[in-house]
C-alpha cells in the first residue's frame, strides 16, 4: 500500500477518486463526477483541499480530505479546515486506513498553519476519529422541521462561520436557492425546503444573485444546525425518521491559543457545510 498526500489538480488522480467514490456509494445510487470534486477541492476561494489517499498499485483504495474555511473565533477571522470526506474501498476495510490517512492530513493542516480542524462525522466514522485521531466530541447538530424563516443566532457565540463574498458566491453556485430577507432557503423534496442559514451577523455582505425559484405555497422547512433560536413551530424530527447523525468533532491545532469549542458557544448552519 502506498500513501500519497496531494492536491487533486491531476486529472488522472481525480478520475481515480471518482471511481472510488462511485464504487463506495454504488448501492445507494449516488453518482460522483470530476466536476463536482473540482468545485469542492480546487475552486474553493479559501484554498485547495488537503487530500490524502492510499493506493494498491494504480487503484485508489482510500481517501480523506480537509476543506479550508474561515471562521470568526472571538471576533477574529481564523483559518481552519473541515474534515469533508473519508471513504475506503469495501475490499480494504478493517485495517484503520481512514484513521491513518486522517492523521497524516491533520499533520499537514497543522504544518500549513491552520488553527483547528473540525468535522461532522456520521455513525460509521465517528468512533475511529475520536479514538484514533485526536478529535473531541462536542455535540450533535439539531435536526428539526417546521414553518417560518425567523431563525436567529441565540446570543453571541464564540465560533461561527465567516463568509467572504467570493466564498459565498462559490458556495451557492451549484444548486437552486432563494433569498428571504437575510436568510437562504434551498430545494430539498416536494413540499420541503432546507433552511440553509441566516447571514444577519454579516449584514454588510452582498448576497450574490442565486438561482431563485418561487414555490407556489408555503413549504415545510428542514433545519440542521446549532446555536439558533427557532420559532415555536419547529419540532425535532421524530426518531423513527432515519437520518445520519451529525456528530460535531473538534481538534485544536493552535497550541492552545484558541478557546475550546463547546456545545454552547457555536453557531452553525446547513450553509456552513456541504450536504445541501
Where are these regions (language model features)?
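Conserved beta-strand in the GNAT
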Residues: 51-53, 59-68, 82, 87, ...
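A short beta-loop-alpha structural element at the N-terminal edge
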Residues: 3-17
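Basic, Lys/Arg-rich alpha-helical nucleic-acid-recognition elements, primarily the DNA-binding modules
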Residues: 13, 37-39, 85
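Conserved acetyl-CoA-binding loop-helix of GNAT-fold acetyltransferases
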Residues: 88, 93-107, 203-217
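Hydrophobic alpha-helical core bundles mediating ligand binding, dimerization, or RNAP-core interactions
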Residues: 17-21, 25, 102
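Active-site/acyl-donor-binding loops of N-acyltransferases
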Residues: 117-156, 192-276
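Recognition helices and adjacent regulatory flanks at domain boundaries
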Residues: 31, 42, 51, 97-108, ...
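Amide-forming acyltransferase catalytic core, primarily the GNAT-like/NAT-type
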Residues: 27-47, 55, 110-114, 123-205, ...
Amino acid at each position: 500500500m502506498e500513501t500519497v498526500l496531494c492536491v487533486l489538480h491531476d486529472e488522472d488522480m481525480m478520475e481515480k477518486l471518482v471511481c472510488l467514490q462511485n464504487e463506495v456509494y454504488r448501492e445507494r445510487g449516488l453518482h460522483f463526477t470530476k466536476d463536482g470534486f473540482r468545485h469542492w477541492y480546487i475552486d474553493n476561494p479559501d484554498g485547495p483541499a488537503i487530500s490524502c489517499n492510499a493506493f494498491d498499485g494504480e487503484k485508489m483504495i482510500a481517501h480523506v480530505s480537509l476543506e479550508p474555511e474561515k471562521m470568526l473565533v472571538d471576533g477574529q477571522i481564523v483559518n481552519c479546515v473541515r474534515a469533508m470526506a473519508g471513504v475506503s474501498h469495501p475490499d480494504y476495510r478493517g485495517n484503520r486506513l481512514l484513521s491513518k490517512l486522517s492523521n497524516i492530513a491533520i499533520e499537514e493542516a497543522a504544518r500549513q498553519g491552520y488553527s483547528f480542524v473540525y468535522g461532522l462525522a456520521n455513525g460509521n466514522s465517528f468512533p475511529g476519529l475520536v479514538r484514533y485521531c485526536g478529535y473531541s466530541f462536542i455535540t450533535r447538530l439539531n435536526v428539526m422541521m417546521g414553518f417560518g424563516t425567523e431563525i436567529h443566532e441565540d446570543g453571541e457565540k464564540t465560533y461561527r462561520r465567516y463568509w467572504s463574498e467570493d466564498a459565498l458566491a462559490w458556495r451557492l453556485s451549484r444548486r437552486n436557492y432563494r433569498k428571504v430577507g437575510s436568510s437562504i432557503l434551498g430545494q430539498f423534496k416536494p413540499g420541503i425546503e432546507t433552511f440553509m442559514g441566516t447571514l444577519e451577523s454579516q449584514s454588510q455582505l452582498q448576497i450574490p444573485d442565486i438561482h431563485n425559484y418561487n414555490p407556489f405555497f408555503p413549504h415545510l422547512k428542514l433545519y440542521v444546525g446549532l446555536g439558533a433560536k427557532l420559532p415555536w413551530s419547529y419540532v425535532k424530527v421524530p426518531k423513527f425518521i432515519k437520518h445520519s447523525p451529525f456528530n460535531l468533532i473538534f481538534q485544536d491545532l493552535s497550541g492552545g491559543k484558541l478557546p475550546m469549542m463547546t456545545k454552547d458557544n457555536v453557531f452553525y448552519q446547513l450553509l456552513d457545510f456541504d450536504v445541501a
